[in-house]
Amino acid sequence: MAIQRTFSILKPDATERNITGAINALIEKAGLRIVAQKRIHMTRGQAETFYAVHKERPFFGELVDFMISGPVVVQVLEGENAIAKYRDVMGATDPSKAADGTIRKAHAKSIGENSVHGSDAPETAAIEIAQFFAGNEIVG
Ligand code: ADP
Ligand code: MG
């Protein structure tokens, strides 16, 4: 399996509770390397662009409001099969359905405030990384 990169966000519920280090520990324990990372406060425009795929969903407004409610940590993760591996480490979107040992099982507050984002495919990973990082900010 090839080395891949995926895009990750530690969401406002994680920065608010000061658990970004605890989440990073789970990421690293899974064998993923944090090859880029910065703390930002997303603008409404950035959040709307990022989640444009969900703009017709009933929770879109709530999701954008949440993502701009506080700072986030955006990251690029690198490793073998990184996209699927990180989805496994994150756990199910709804923390009540997330498996033991996953980030969302351990830390998520609700289906909306669920601590982390991870890309779902190589195409979306490339688009999401490029939205937030220049090439020279990623150091593998
Ligand atoms: P995932 O983040 O697991 O890929 P989705 O892409 O389906 O999940 O949804 C994007 C984000 O929208 C979720 O992580 C969550 O923050 C939010 N969300 C999804 N479903 C709901 C819902 N039913 N109610 C509120 N927020 C939701
Ligand atoms: Mg998704």
Swiss-Prot record:
| Keyword entries, A-Z | ATP-binding, Cytoplasm, Kinase, Magnesium, Metal-binding, Nucleotide metabolism, Nucleotide-binding, Phosphoprotein, Transferase
Needed co-factor(s): Mg(2+)
Q: Which residues bind ATP?
A: 11, 59, 87, 93, 104, 114
Q: Which GO terms describe its biological process?
A: CTP biosynthetic process; GTP biosynthetic process; UTP biosynthetic process
EC number(s) per entry: 2.7.4.6
State the protein's purpose.
Major role in the synthesis of nucleoside triphosphates other than ATP. The ATP gamma phosphate is transferred to the NDP beta phosphate via a ping-pong mechanism, using a phosphorylated active-site intermediate.
Enzyme class of the recorded protein, top EC level: transferase
Protein's name according to its UniProt entry: Nucleoside diphosphate kinase
Database matches in Gene3D superfamilies: Nucleoside diphosphate kinase-like domain
Q: Where in the cell is it found?
A: Cytoplasm
* Superkingdom as given in the UniProt entry: Bacteria
> Record's NCBIfam families?
PRK00668.1
Self-association or partners: how does it assemble?
Homotetramer.
Q: Which gene encodes it?
A: ndk
Where are the catalytic residues?
117 (pros-phosphohistidine intermediate)
Extract the InterPro entries matched here. Answer: NDK-like_dom, NDK-like_dom_sf, Nucleoside_diP_kinase, Nucleoside_diP_kinase_AS
